[in-house]
């Protein structure tokens, strides 16, 4: 039985001259607001015109592939929602596989995230007449290694008198995101209990009016401690929302208010994260029970 593993992620431009096309994809071909374009140019210029995210995801793919090379029955692919190779470009390569395991690289179960990746994936599968059993893994926080992975990362920055700010991406339609909130709260609670972190809370970044809150810009003000340690628990790899929005913008603000800032490392292509993905793939293959994909039929989800 041959299985295709599809790692799904947002994608990012490879150089400054790619930014206009990248933003056009995000806005679905509609005009990009001038302020948004200027902000993105400013961000990418700070990092030499390149986010590290595509390189990290390729390394994740390569390292995960090595875990399955000996068996020879699993091939790992990457596809981006807003860059190349796109989901539509990669799906034709999935012909001939008995199973597909699709994993958006996002920590928590989310209706918004699920829809944003599953819809173009299902459309591409139908367009290419691929009718294969598929497991769509909506969130990875319900797997055993998720919490130990974050504990390991936090221990690298653990300092006694600190406020631990667990940071998650805000999402629209909060009425549909009860499970997202549950897994965020549950994971934060388990980590703080196991580690004995006395001062912590969670907040959201990147939101708009009516999205999930509270904002991290409101939460840090609760801290009695003057050292803030950010734990971006809903993210899995370095990209500009981490390197710019947190490490530059947020840091600048809290330092102006007299706080110091540190951030725990991201999972990226670490051995423990690759092991977590390996276990997800192996588990999905073992109990794969999705309906045939095609002609609008539903998929299976691996979710407790």
Swiss-Prot record:
Signal peptide: none annotated. Coiled coil: none annotated. SUPFAM superfamilies: Chelatase. The keyword Lyase applies. One of its GO terms (cellular component) is cytoplasm. Fe cation binds at residues 169, 241. Keywords: Cytoplasm, Heme biosynthesis, Iron, Lyase, Metal-binding, Porphyrin biosynthesis. Its main location: cytoplasm. It catalyses: heme b + 2 H(+) = protoporphyrin IX + Fe(2+). Pfam families: Ferrochelatase. GO terms for molecular function: ferrochelatase activity; metal ion binding. It is found in: Cytoplasm. Pathway: Porphyrin-containing compound metabolism; protoheme biosynthesis; protoheme from protoporphyrin-IX: step 1/1. The keyword Transmembrane does not apply. It comes from the Archaea. Its EC number is 4.98.1.1. InterPro entries: Ferrochelatase, Ferrochelatase_C, Ferrochelatase_N. One of its GO terms (biological process) is heme biosynthetic process. It is an enzyme of class 4 (lyase). Catalyzes the ferrous insertion into protoporphyrin IX. Belongs to the ferrochelatase family. PANTHER family: FERROCHELATASE, FERROCHELATASE, MITOCHONDRIAL. This is Ferrochelatase.
């Amino acid at each position: 039985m041959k299985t295709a593993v599809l790692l799904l992620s947002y994608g990012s431009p490879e150089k400054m001259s790619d930014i206009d096309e990248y933003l056009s994809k995000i806005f679905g071909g509609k005009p990009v607001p001038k302020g948004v374009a200027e902000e993105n140019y400013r961000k990418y210029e700070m990092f030499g015109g390149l986010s590290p995210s595509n390189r990290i995801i390729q390394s994740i793919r390569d390292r995960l592939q090595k875990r399955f090379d000996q068996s020879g029955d699993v091939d790992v692919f990457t596809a981006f929602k807003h860059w190349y190779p796109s989901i539509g470009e990669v799906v034709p390569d999935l012909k001939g596989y008995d199973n597909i395991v699709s994993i958006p690289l996002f920590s928590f179960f989310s209706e918004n995230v699920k829809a944003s990746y599953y819809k173009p994936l299902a459309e591409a599968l139908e367009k290419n007449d691929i009718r294969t059993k598929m497991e769509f893994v909506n969130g990875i926080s319900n797997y055993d290694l998720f919490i130990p992975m974050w504990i390991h990362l936090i221990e690298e920055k653990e300092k006694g008198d600190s406020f631990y700010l667990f940071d998650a991406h805000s999402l629209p339609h909060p009425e549909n995101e009860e499970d997202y909130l549950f897994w965020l709260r549950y994971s934060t609670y388990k980590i703080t209990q196991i580690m004995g972190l006395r001062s912590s809370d969670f907040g959201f970044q990147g939101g708009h009016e009516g999205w999930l809150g509270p904002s991290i810009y409101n939460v840090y003000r609760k801290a009695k401690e003057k050292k803030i340690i950010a734990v971006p628990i809903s993210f899995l790899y370095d990209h500009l929302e981490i390197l710019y929005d947190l490490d530059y913008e947020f840091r600048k603000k809290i330092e102006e208010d007299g706080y110091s800032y540190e951030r725990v490392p991201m999972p990226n292509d670490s051995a423990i994260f690759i092991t977590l993905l390996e276990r997800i793939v192996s588990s999905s293959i073992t109990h794969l029970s999705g309906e045939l994909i095609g002609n609008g039929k539903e998929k299976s989800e691996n979710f407790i």
